[in-house]
Amino acid sequence: MSIKIENLEKHFGSFHALKNINLQFKQNQLTALLGPSGCGKTTLLRIIAGLEFADSGKILFEHRDVTDLSAKDRGVGFVFQHYALFQNMTVYDNVAFGLRVKPRKERPSKEEIQQKVTALLKLVKLDWLANAYPNQLSGGQRQRIALARSLAVQPKVLLLDEPFGALDAQVRKELRRWLRDLHQELNVTSIFVTHDQDEALDVSDRIVVMNQGQIEQIDEPNQIYHAPQTPFVTQFVGDVNVFHGHIDEGNLVIGEFSHKIDPATNTTQPVNNQSATAYIRPYELTISRHADNALATGKITHINAIGFIVRIEIESAQSDQPIEVILTKAAYSQSQYKVNEQIYLVPDKLNLFQQMNI
């Protein structure tokens, strides 16, 4: 089922939580609402669910206006960050709960409930824990049971609010992979909220990046990472080094350094005499012992050679923050850079935002 949001506004007192949100969720797609705390992503999810109501605007489920309907009349499944399982019920009874409390005319038979619950427990790969209680499960297992319980009532839309936020890093990684595979089997429109960029990039078909109650960019994960459209998205999704300067005759000038901008690798056409900010990924910077076409100079302060890449930190007068460069082990072995060595930085690619774009 597709979902359409039209001109949505929401205030909490004087706080403007959502500002004219217009958005479409395609049928059977897994969409991430990504952004920092307070950006409005959870408020938007709760309004879609019917747990909150907008001040103005519309919510359409497959062209049906559900703006004023309660949560129980919208046919959505909701998974919270903190499981919300019934502690006095077994795993089986938790999953069966939504089916058992349906109105008598809609309630499946005991046999149908048993078949449905058994199938769902197999789907989440926890059928062997049917008779266990929540306090006997790990955090990851509890969240999978919470998801199975939401799916039991066959929701038209599945909504997940930071579903892995309470779990440790390794379990989160495992469940991300599991959720991605599971969604391909389910054929249900799913929306999940996260502040974790890796989670959004790894799991979703599409990402909606939000900031201060507004949508910054809507795109596929690859485009969000490699072709961010605003300075906020550029800095929020992935690591970047930031350099402030101005444009002069097709060059980015930072202090005494003038870097010739290559139109083939720069994301925007430079405009003369404009202030500009360059965002450069750590792997898009080259370290050199020569000043040719350099953007900055600095001193190496730290080298981390653990793993299959080498991370090098550099202090530079041309940047407000320490600069990070990522090299392959082979490139590092050839160059043999040392801590306290003075080097130059040459960008392979610039993501440039000029004053008129900011």
From Swiss-Prot:
It is an enzyme of class 7 (translocase). This is Sulfate/thiosulfate import ATP-binding protein CysA. It holds the Pfam family ABC_tran. One of its GO terms (cellular component) is ATP-binding cassette (ABC) transporter complex. Residues 3-237 form the ABC transporter domain. SUPFAM superfamilies: MOP-like, P-loop containing nucleoside triphosphate hydrolases. Belongs to the ABC transporter superfamily. Sulfate/tungstate importer (TC 3.A.1.6) family. PANTHER family: SPERMIDINE/PUTRESCINE IMPORT ATP-BINDING PROTEIN POTA (PTHR42781), SPERMIDINE_PUTRESCINE IMPORT ATP-BINDING PROTEIN POTA (PTHR42781:SF4). ATP binds at G35, P36, S37, G38, C39, G40, K41, T42. Part of the ABC transporter complex CysAWTP involved in sulfate/thiosulfate import. Responsible for energy coupling to the transport system. The keyword Transport applies. It is a peripheral membrane protein. One of its GO terms (molecular function) is ABC-type thiosulfate transporter activity. Keywords: ATP-binding, Cell inner membrane, Cell membrane, Membrane, Nucleotide-binding, Sulfate transport, Translocase, Transport. It is found in: Cell inner membrane. SMART domains: AAA. Its EC number is 7.3.2.3. PROSITE patterns: ABC_TRANSPORTER_1, ABC_TRANSPORTER_2, CYSA. The complex is composed of two ATP-binding proteins (CysA), two transmembrane proteins (CysT and CysW) and a solute-binding protein (CysP). It catalyses: sulfate(out) + ATP + H2O = sulfate(in) + ADP + phosphate + H(+); thiosulfate(out) + ATP + H2O = thiosulfate(in) + ADP + phosphate + H(+).
